Amino acid sequence: VQRLQNAGVLTPDSLLAHCTYVDDVGLDIIRRSGSSIVNCPESDLFNSTGCCPVFKILEKGITLGIGSDSYAADMLEVAKMSLSELRHTAGLPNAGFPEVARILFDGNAKIASRTFGIPIGRIQKGAAADIIIMDYIPYTPLSAVNTDRHIIFGMSGHECVMTMAAGRVLMRNRRLTFAREDILSRKTTAAAEDLWQSVNQDAQNRLLHYE
């Protein structure tokens, strides 16, 4: 973190991902810079790279969001993993839920609003029309008091039937509106094979060089 500060890259527009090894000194630097942190719990746990110090970050008043470095695409599953991570690190079976809800609903909206220069994360005049519709059937009482718990515990991405971004419907009835998924699949599969071949060839060339 000190190196980033010395290089002049820590600004209110900076996003610091993971931060599993950051200490109190580093967090104080981040707080003073106005930078934000994004926790990526599924990737961190999968790669055994440690856990983001969520409680310390929030205590210091640093803006914290939750996301993924492409390991996961379902943010509700990421939120569930974040909750498990927090309870494990705290050693308390009842800890973490208020923090996860705050990160998911408030932290992400604050970061996105600042990044894109428009209110995000609310339904009101002048805000970005970013809306999803979930086909969710609650099996316990659902009210304004426990909506966040139903979202995090009860829902998952496969229940999303409509996605709208900036007023444009991108998915309707679980089908993309702007592209054909079969064509995308063929293109991404071919691109992945080309990438793998290129990486393998580069690795072989390096081995030959060192031999």
Q: Language-model segments: which ranges?
A:
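Histidine/acidic residue-rich metal-binding segments in metalloenzymes
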Residues: 1-36, 47-64
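Conserved strand-to-helix beginnings and helix N-cap segments that scaffold or border functional pockets
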Residues: 27, 50-51, 76, 145, ...
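Short, acidic/turn-prone active-site loops that include or flank metal/cofactor-
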Residues: 41-46, 69-71
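Active-site glycine- and acidic-residue-rich loops that bind
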Residues: 45-48, 114-116
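His/Asp/Glu-enriched, well-ordered alpha-helical/loop segment
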Residues: 6-9, 13, 53-138, 154-155
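Short, electropositive alpha-helical surface patch
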Residues: 30-40, 190-194, 198
